[in-house]
């Protein structure tokens, strides 16, 4: 290490933990930051640089990149270093090596080393913290422990099985010949358990924050750490490890693929494993984003007048699409103009106020789990006795009930049909990984709405749809991307006939307050 630094080699390290400090000569960073190591003469404290900032930092808070090389400008996957002993407690650097097999061996050894260290962290959490907490019924309830630790024991059991299979595939004599790609593919479904843990992590942090205000809990958790002989990291740092770990797999596999020759027996398996793990992390991040947006859904529901039935969050967590259409509920029924909000599992129907177009009234909902979508060709419908254009139906598979919808334009109809397919796909994926909103998260969203109502006043709320992802293709440009604070009258204005307003109504609405 010292030879590399004094030899003008660029030695880079990645932060494994957040280092929060107020000291002038210490370097603050977050997990994932890349640090240029300038001095490693002290085994415990190194001197490093991030951008223009330099300072001391704990050596145990970082991991050295597997491969280091001179003059690197491409990032962590393009940096090279010497051999890594997977059984050691640190990464040992030697002279830069250009041999591709050696580079692959370095990455394999790093993967094995980090997996073994990760298993130890999980064991420390389960035995050092969770096991001790269960003994103190006077301090922790079962519900509290579920919030704080989530499904960490399930993750521990899964990782032990995963590492056992990795060890079987590891070639100790020639690490570059190891075939670990199939292990990721065989266990790909098991990695979805991280979704529940990541979704719960924010609740865990909030619960810990409340407990840590009491010195009893501070002393208890510190005693647990010392008893288990764990490194000097707070409990919230240990609980962050699984979240960081699942995000690291695509980075490690991408680096492994780079140093794997295409004629290597493991190449196609590593490539497939990289695609799988990227999809897992992408879906986990997407579901975490959805949970972060549930406050907006709760706020939107609170702004809709005359709400009836269960809350949106009881079944749904994402607004997929919204728009205004003509709707006929039953044969020979009257054509009605409604604003529709398609969530996962349900579609909510609302009616605009006749004068205040930014105010919505609740008019019902459709359970999408019971309905199928039927595309209808233009022409006459004998059942409803109407001429149809840009129409589609929702058919209840149990009761044979049918709803008929008319879009303004063909493009809008296509967007709705695509949205319905997306809704079904989302529901199936959520069921596959067991995604759901916890009762604690629902309570937090409700509290946020109540606080906002007290601050702004109930009458100031407007029926603005919650945000959702941007369009994926040109056809989706018709989606209503509504930032917070914009009234719906601005959003849906194009669907209303243009007419000038009488001065009488302008004066009336200004001078005569009344309750809707």
Swiss-Prot record:
Biological process terms from the Gene Ontology for this record are:
regulation of postsynaptic specialization assembly; small GTPase-mediated signal transduction
The UniProt GO MF terms for this protein read: guanyl-nucleotide exchange factor activity
> What superkingdom heads the lineage?
Eukaryota
Entry keyword Ribonucleoprotein: no
Q: What organism is recorded for this protein?
A: Mus musculus
- Domain PH residues, every copy: 318-425
Q: Does the keyword Calcium apply?
A: no
GO cellular component terms given for this protein? cell cortex; GABA-ergic synapse; postsynaptic density
Q: Where is this region: Interaction with GPHN?
A: 100-110
Describe tissue expression: Detected in embryonic and adult brain.
- Region of interest: Disordered: 450-480
The molecule here is called: Rho guanine nucleotide exchange factor 9
Residue numbers carrying Phosphoserine: 502
Q: Where is the DH domain?
A: 103-287
């Amino acid at each position: 290490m010292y030879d590399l630094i004094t030899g003008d080699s660029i030695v880079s390290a990645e932060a494994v933990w957040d280092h929060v400090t107020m000291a002038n000569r210490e370097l603050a960073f977050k997990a994932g930051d890349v640090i240029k190591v300038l001095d490693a003469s002290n085994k415990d404290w190194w001197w490093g640089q991030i951008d223009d900032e330099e300072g001391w930092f704990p050596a145990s808070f970082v991991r050295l990149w597997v491969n280091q090389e001179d003059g690197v400008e491409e990032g962590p996957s393009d940096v090279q270093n010497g051999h890594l002993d997977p059984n050691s407690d640190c990464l040992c650097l030697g002279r830069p090596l250009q041999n591709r097999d050696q580079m692959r061996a370095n990455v394999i050894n790093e993967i094995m080393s980090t997996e073994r260290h990760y298993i130890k962290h999980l064991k420390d959490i389960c035995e050092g913290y969770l096991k001790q907490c269960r003994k103190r019924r006077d301090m922790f309830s079962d519900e509290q422990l579920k919030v704080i630790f989530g499904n960490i024991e399930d993750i521990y059991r899964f990782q032990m099985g995963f590492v056992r299979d990795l060890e079987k595939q590891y070639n100790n004599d020639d690490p570059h010949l190891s075939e670990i790609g199939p292990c990721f593919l065989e266990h790909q479904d098991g990695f979805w358990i991280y979704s529940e843990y990541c979704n719960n992590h924010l609740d865990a942090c909030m619960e810990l924050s409340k407990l840590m205000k009491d010195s009893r809990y501070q002393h208890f958790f510190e005693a647990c750490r010392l008893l288990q002989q764990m490194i000097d990291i707070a409990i919230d740092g240990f609980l962050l490890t699984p979240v960081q770990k699942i995000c690291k797999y695509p980075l490690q596999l991408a680096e492994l693929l780079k140093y794997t020759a295409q004629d290597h027996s493991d190449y196609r398996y590593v490539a497939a494993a990289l695609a799988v793990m990227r999809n897992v992390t992408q879906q986990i991040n997407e579901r975490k984003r959805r949970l972060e947006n549930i406050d907006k859904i709760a706020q939107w529901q609170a702004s809709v007048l005359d709400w009836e039935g269960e809350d949106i969050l009881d079944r749904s967590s994402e607004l997929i699409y919204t728009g205004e259409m003509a709707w006929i509920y039953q044969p020979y029924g009257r054509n009605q103009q409604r604003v529709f909000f398609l969530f996962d599992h349900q579609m909510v129907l609302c009616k605009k106020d006749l004068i205040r177009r930014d105010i919505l009234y609740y008019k019902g909902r459709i359970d999408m789990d019971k309905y199928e979508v039927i595309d209808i060709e233009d022409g006459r419908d004998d059942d409803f006795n109407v001429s149809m254009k840009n129409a589609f139906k929702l058919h209840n598979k149990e009761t044979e009930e049918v709803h008929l919808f008319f879009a303004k334009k063909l493009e809008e109809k296509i967007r709705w049909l695509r949205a319905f397919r997306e809704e079904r796909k989302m529901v199936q994926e959520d069921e596959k990984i067991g995604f759901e909103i916890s009762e604690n998260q629902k309570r937090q969203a409700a509290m946020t709405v109540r606080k906002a109502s007290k601050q702004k006043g109930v009458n100031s709320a407007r029926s603005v749809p919650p945000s959702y992802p941007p369009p994926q293709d040109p056809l989706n440009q018709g989606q209503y991307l509504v930032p917070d604070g914009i009234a719906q009258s601005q959003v849906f204005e194009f669907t209303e006939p243009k007419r000038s307003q009488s001065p009488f109504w302008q004066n009336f609405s200004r001078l005569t307050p009344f309750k809707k």
